[in-house]
Design a protein with these regions (language model features):
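Electropositive nucleic-acid engagement tracts
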Residues: 2-85
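Extended interaction regions within the primary functional domain
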Residues: 5-8, 18, 109-112, 123-127
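Short, contiguous clusters of charged residues that form electrostatic/catalytic patches at enzyme active sites
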Residues: 37, 73, 88-89, 131, ...
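Short, conserved catalytic/metal-binding motifs centered on acidic residues
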Residues: 39, 88-95, 106, 114, ...
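Structured nucleic-acid-interacting core domains from mobile-element enzymes and related host factors
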Residues: 65-115
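An internal, acidic/charged active-site-proximal segment
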Residues: 121-203
């Protein structure tokens, strides 16, 4: 059934690529793991474990396997259920290997779960800039063009005013967490900390 579903939503003409994709999905579900050694245990093959892992690696490194192109038709169909709805999207990130790599993901919030819309991998530590996430945000905006309103949520790691400016450009509302000592420049030129403005927590 997974194969049939993928064939109905994805234009990939090479059936072998679709079949390999299906078995990777099955491996993810049955193993409850993203580790290739665990996924490979659920791939039917006469090869030993190392051979099955190599098979998955070859599929992942195939130049014709572009993850966004494979994922986009699936998420586009899923998002039809949110047409004309008000939605919330969450940007979060994590790092691995002593911050050698940072992963950023923009997800649709739904029933205390996060449905991935777009993602980005960045080398090295440090705060991410909105310029580096431009493609990620634009991809999500394209996917969400049928919804009524979008509210962007992020923590204090994305507090730069450029993020707010980008949200306004996309016609998104936004709620970006900031530290209570963050300075705000008023119309008269004064710079005051947020905690001196009488703003209640959560507002």
């Amino acid at each position: 059934r997974v194969f049939t579903k993928l064939r109905t939503v994805h234009p990939e003409p090479h059936l072998k690529r679709i079949a390999n994709w299906v078995w990777v999905i099955v491996g993810l579900i049955l193993s409850h793991s993203v580790h290739l050694s665990q996924i490979a245990q659920h791939i039917p093959s006469e090869a030993q474990a190392a051979g099955r892992i190599a098979q998955v690696r070859r599929w992942l490194s195939n130049k014709f396997i572009q993850v966004p192109d494979f994922y986009r038709p699936l998420i586009t169909e899923a998002l039809q259920g949110w047409a004309h709805q008000d939605v919330f999207v969450i940007l979060d990130g994590c790092s691995v290997n002593h911050e050698a790599l940072q992963f950023f993901r923009l997800s649709l919030s739904h029933c205390f779960r996060a449905i991935p819309l777009a993602w980005l991998v960045v080398k090295g530590p440090g705060l991410i800039t909105v310029e580096k996430c431009e493609a990620l945000l634009n991809e999500a905006a394209q996917l969400l063009r049928q919804v009524a309103t979008v509210t962007f949520l992020a923590d204090r790691g994305f507090r730069d005013k450029d993020w707010a400016r980008k949200c306004r450009k996309l016609r998104w509302n936004y709620g970006i967490r900031v530290a209570n000592n963050t300075g705000v420049t008023l119309a008269d030129g004064r710079v005051l900390a947020v905690n001196t403005l009488g703003v209640k927590a959560g507002h």
